[in-house]
Curated annotation (Swiss-Prot):
Organism: Bombyx mori
Organism placement in taxonomy: Eukaryota, Metazoa, Ecdysozoa, Arthropoda, Hexapoda
Predominant location category: cytoplasm
Keyword DNA repair appears in the UniProt entry: no
Designated name of the protein: Eukaryotic translation initiation factor 3 subunit I
Keyword Protein biosynthesis: yes
Pfam families in the record: EIF3I
Gene Ontology cellular-component annotations: eukaryotic 43S preinitiation complex; eukaryotic 48S preinitiation complex; eukaryotic translation initiation factor 3 complex, eIF3m
Intervals holding WD repeats: 8-47, 50-89, 145-184, 187-226, 284-323
Coiled coil: none
Compartment(s) of residence: Cytoplasm
Length: 329
């Protein structure tokens, strides 16, 4: 299982994402230039130049036509994927922490940090036609977050809701017709660092600094499963073909210099989705894993770390042959 090492960033990776077909892999880092790679051979296709600071988030629409990025330069940008051109720039009052296209890509949402006297806010914009005029358009919907700030976000089913994960560990579901809260749960005790949907969108997995990842129902926010570790979890992803979930994390970045990689703190850890049991680990990064993504065909996965590398791992046949031992009575 020799990984591809993608080296195109000067600083720590913040988020990685595959497009729907899985032929492209996108990476965002703290060095202001998102990259796009061929996922098959690790060749870099290009960079998106324009941001003036750290990139916290990115997303690609289902047709792989446009890219959305958000960063510490208080802007959310829309890009033409083919040319790398910055089509529109949406200015905000503080850092853009999360951004996502809806499933249809008719809309996109992004959230800003509570900073510099400005509140944490959620914006929903119309992305049916993306051109220069988007920069001056008012959002379709915008609301203030009075609770702790949003640290992760996904779209709910049928593009009717948005689910936000917060610094205090809350999960809140919002109605997109009104911008009102539908309901909320608090199953985590610390910040929710990542949220990723299952392939069919019925479930999602959260990663948290409280040393757990948890599986929730998308519609009811009911807690289904819990995966426990001994250290903060920065990212978690669900396999599209098997009942597996992969977790990545480690200590906080500022403590990393004091530990050896031999301690296994920076491994990607595989758990069984149903039985909540860990069954495998993959070593590699020289620091915490900040972002994980399964390839849409489920035959490989990628990890982005604090060391600035993206590693693409293709699974061996033994991974697919492995079955969990349990009584079938």
């Amino acid at each position: 299982m020799k990984p591809l090492m993608l080296q195109g960033h000067q600083r720590a990776i913040t988020q990685i994402k595959y497009n729907r077909e899985g032929d492209l892999l996108f990476s965002a880092a703290k060095d202001s230039k998102p990259n796009v790679w061929w996922s098959l051979n690790g060749e870099r296709l290009g960079t998106f130049n324009g941001h003036g600071g750290v990139i916290w988030c990115l997303d690609v629409d289902w047709q792989s036509i446009n890219l959305i990025t958000g960063g510490g330069d208080s802007s959310c940008r829309l890009w033409d994927l083919e040319t790398g051109k910055n089509i529109a720039t949406l200015k905000s009052n503080s850092s853009v922490r999360t951004c996502n296209f809806s499933y249809s890509a008719y809309q996109a949402a992004y959230t800003t940090d509570k900073a510099m006297g400005h509140p944490c806010e959620v914006f929903v914009i119309d992305t049916r036609t993306i051109d220069e005029t988007v920069s001056g358009q008012a959002p379709i919907l915008k609301w203030e977050i009075t609770d702790s700030k949003v640290t992760s976000m996904i779209w709910g089913s049928l593009d009717e809701t948005i689910i936000t994960g917060h610094e205090a560990g809350d999960l809140i579901q919002w109605d997109l017709r009104t911008g009102k809260k539908i309901h909320s749960v608090k199953e985590h005790t610390h910040q929710i660092t990542d949220m990723q949907l299952s392939r069919d969108g019925t479930m999602f997995v959260t990663a948290s600094k409280d040393h757990t990842a948890k599986l929730f129902d998308t519609n009811s926010l009911e807690l289904l499963k819990e995966y426990k570790t001994e250290r903060p979890v920065n990212s978690a992803a669900l396999s599209p073909i098997l009942d597996h979930v992969v977790l990545g994390g480690g200590q906080d970045a500022m403590e990393v210099t004091t530990t050896s990689t031999r301690q296994g703190k920076f491994d990607a850890r595989f758990f069984h989705l149903v039985f909540e049991e860990e069954f495998g680990r993959v070593k590699g990064h020289f620091g915490p894993i900040n972002s994980l993504a399964f390839h849409p065909d489920g035959k490989s996965y990628a990890s982005g770390g604090e060391d600035g590398y993206v590693r693409v791992h293709n699974f061996d046949q033994s991974y697919f042959d492995y079955t969990f031992d349990y009584n079938r009575e």
